[in-house]
Amino acid sequence: MIIEIFYQTRKCFVPRMNCADEVSMTNFHSDEYDDIHCSLKSFEEAFAFFEQLERNGDVKSYCNGANKSGRWIFQIYSTEFVEELAAVINRALGRRRKTPPVLEIMSGDGRLTEFLQPLVKRHCIATDSRDGRYNIGYPKWVETLDAMDAIAKYSPSFIIMCWEPYLSMTGIEIVKMGIPVAWIGNPNMCGHTDIFDRYHIPLESKFALSRHDIFMEKEFKTDVFFFNCKPKWI
């Protein structure tokens, strides 16, 4: 079944913050913008931040490291987004006696794993091949492993993939293994579209934000897609 809904853009209502709230979350008069992922913000705060960046014409440069931490940003995390992802992972884990870890592959700087760990009832491990494609600052605790080697090493109970490289076939090979997977990204710009020929369940998240969105038009282009997962977990 080929996904169709996300080949178009997703639109939803986003509440407006007042001006005081918008200004307090960042200093738009400084030489560099604050790092939105320095700590986890609410969806409303994150949306307002990027709406202002878009007004200034700075979304692309900001996401390419023009912020106080020099952080590259692809998916934009918020409290609500992380909480709903963690809830699905916890339901998938259930009450199993065995405790293999949750594994994030292609994790970049591992920020999603950091945000998820306090909410997930299993040890979370972040890995990345560090292939030099982007100028990402990798913390030492992000283990240098490509996706297949990481899976072979840790035999995870659940796998997270966020912004798989465009036209990569790795996601398809991983889904074929039968391990529960959360695939996060823009179906038109991440991974290979053939992955959606396999059975999957979209989260249809109201809180998914990314660098590709058109914030002032409230057009959002990413979601979480679950493979090898039961509908009752979502």
Regions found by a protein language model. Give the residues of each.
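S-adenosyl-L-methionine
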Residues: I2-L93
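Adenosine-cofactor binding site in Rossmann-like domains, unifying the SAM/SAH pocket
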Residues: I125-K153
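A short SAM/SAH-binding and catalytic strip from SAM-dependent methyltransferases
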Residues: S157-S168
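C-terminal substrate-binding/active-site "lid" region of AdoMet-derived donor-dependent transferases
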Residues: L167-F225
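Rossmann-like AdoMet/SAM-dependent catalytic core
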Residues: T222-F226, K230-I234
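Conserved SAM-binding loop of SAM-dependent methyltransferases across substrates and taxa
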Residues: R111-L119
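Short, polar loop motifs at secondary-structure junctions
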Residues: G110, D128-R133, Y166, N186-M189
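Conserved class I S-adenosyl-L-methionine
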Residues: P100-G108
